[in-house]
UniProtKB/Swiss-Prot annotation:
Recorded superkingdom: Eukaryota
Protein name: Putative uncharacterized protein ART3
PANTHER family from the UniProt entry: TRANSMEMBRANE PROTEIN
Record's miscellaneous remark: Encoded on the antisense strand of the nuclear 35S rDNA.
Amino acid sequence: MPPGIPRGAMCVQRFDDSRNSAIHITYRISLRSSSMREPRDPLLKVFNILKFPVTKILVFDKNLMNR
């Protein structure tokens, strides 16, 4: 990303139907708090869970713990 543009900025491009057919570029700054995680982080975790499922399940028996 070019220097001077905030990390949370998003580049949106659309074609103008005018004679010039100019491309308008708009930077939108997200209003989310800097302390919140990026939205792609939870998606990556879900992907990892689905791609690499856990094959072992641990079961604890309370009766065995008291012996």
